Amino acid sequence: MKVAISGGGTGGHVYPALALIRELKKSHPEAEFLYIGTEKGLEAGIVKREGIPFEAIEITGFKRSLSLENIKTVMRFLSGAKKSKQILRDFKPDVVIGTGGYVCGPVVYAAAKLKIPTLIHEQNSVAGLTNKFLSRYTDKVAICFEEVSDSFASEKIVFTGNPRASEVVGVDSEGALEAYGLVSGKPTVLVFGGSRGARGVNEAVEAVLPEWNNRDFQLLYVTGDVHYEKIKDSLAELNLGNHISVQPFIYDMPKILNAVTLVVSRAGATTLAELTALGVPSILIPSPYVTANHQENNARALEKNNAAIVITEAELKNTDLMATVDSILNDEAKLNSMKLSAKQMGRPDAAAKLVEAVLSIMK
């Protein structure tokens, strides 16, 4: 079996693709894979480090508003589709999968024109422009949020969830908190704003750290590499207790997620898939700097089901973050209710469901 996969730009498109590849390898160890992305995207480094064959095309994204740049993008799309056809003819895949981001546009389009079975995976509650366009040509559209179903033809939709969810379930958390100077078994809050951190989240947390010194529950505060040194210097005079650990980055996130009680974070699709698969309650601060405000829409889906509390970045200045954390951790009934609600939304079998959908369209 030969499988071509394309998706990129951000980790939210790349990591689900890699999770799918790993799941496919379990049942089809003989399978061959080819990843098609861009050299400038996050995918180039990540995929190559995984040892997966990689081919690059050149493409840029469409602007949502009218722009002369879109004319250039159309030309790049056509050129990318032409190169994709050649790559696919040489590789001869049995199926082509797109996991989002503009790079998968010409790849999946070319595959459809070559009559190769195709599937796209939409991680968010708001459909991306590329996936909206491709859905006219693909055989199946795999989704993670019911809210996005109106964007696609109902006969093509299959609800799978995000395959990254499957990779955090059952991970051994022994020693996870100790690695960061904390104690296992104590209520612990994880705060992070994505791989690079988020200034708005950091400012809100810094404002309540003096209060946190007086709390019994632990804090694992991940600032992001970019912000770490500045924040570390500003906290030097606070004499933070041993129950507060400030880190630039977390490399073993699946282990940590299995060890914490509550998460304060952005609302990226992959993060929410992981939290719900594990049944971890959350306080979500959606990034306002994303396309079509999709993070807030993602977060509201959890809020509607009592799995999270949502605070927009605009609301942060007038919201007592410490009081919000207290309202959850000091109310066992509320904490347990949010855990149960998050767990009910989770799709720990998402990777297997997505593989099932892929195999169903293969000739």
UniProtKB/Swiss-Prot annotation:
Q: Which UniProt keywords apply?
A: Cell cycle, Cell division, Cell membrane, Cell shape, Cell wall biogenesis/degradation, Glycosyltransferase, Membrane, Peptidoglycan synthesis, Transferase
Q: Can you tell me which residues bind UDP-N-acetyl-alpha-D-glucosamine?
A: 10-12, 124, 195, 250, 295
Range of residues in the leader sequence: none
Q: Name one GO cellular component term.
A: plasma membrane
Class of the enzyme per the UniProt entry, highest EC level = transferase
Task: Spell out the subcellular localization from the entry.
Answer: Cell membrane
Pfam families reported for this sequence: Glyco_tran_28_C, Glyco_transf_28
State its Enzyme Commission number(s).
2.4.1.227
* The reaction(s) this protein catalyses: di-trans,octa-cis-undecaprenyl diphospho-N-acetyl-alpha-D-muramoyl-L-alanyl-D-glutamyl-meso-2,6-diaminopimeloyl-D-alanyl-D-alanine + UDP-N-acetyl-alpha-D-glucosamine = di-trans,octa-cis-undecaprenyl diphospho-[N-acetyl-alpha-D-glucosaminyl-(1->4)]-N-acetyl-alpha-D-muramoyl-L-alanyl-D-glutamyl-meso-2,6-diaminopimeloyl-D-alanyl-D-alanine + UDP + H(+)
A GO molecular function assigned to this protein is: undecaprenyldiphospho-muramoylpentapeptide beta-N-acetylglucosaminyltransferase activity
- Biological or metabolic pathway of the protein: Cell wall biogenesis; peptidoglycan biosynthesis
* Membrane topology note: Peripheral membrane protein
Q: Its domain of life? A: Bacteria
Looking up PANTHER family in the UniProt record yields: GLYCOSYLTRANSFERASE (PTHR21015:SF22), UDP-N-ACETYLGLUCOSAMINE--N-ACETYLMURAMYL-(PENTAPEPTIDE) PYROPHOSPHORYL-UNDECAPRENOL N-ACETYLGLUCOSAMINE TRANSFERASE 1 (PTHR21015)
| Function (record text) | Cell wall formation. Catalyzes the transfer of a GlcNAc subunit on undecaprenyl-pyrophosphoryl-MurNAc-pentapeptide (lipid intermediate I) to form undecaprenyl-pyrophosphoryl-MurNAc-(pentapeptide)GlcNAc (lipid intermediate II).
Q: Which NCBIfam families match?
A: murG (TIGR01133)
UniProt-recorded name of the protein: UDP-N-acetylglucosamine--N-acetylmuramyl-(pentapeptide) pyrophosphoryl-undecaprenol N-acetylglucosamine transferase
Annotated organism of origin: Listeria monocytogenes serovar 1/2a (strain ATCC BAA-679 / EGD-e)
Show the taxonomic lineage. Answer: Bacteria, Bacillati, Bacillota, Bacilli, Bacillales
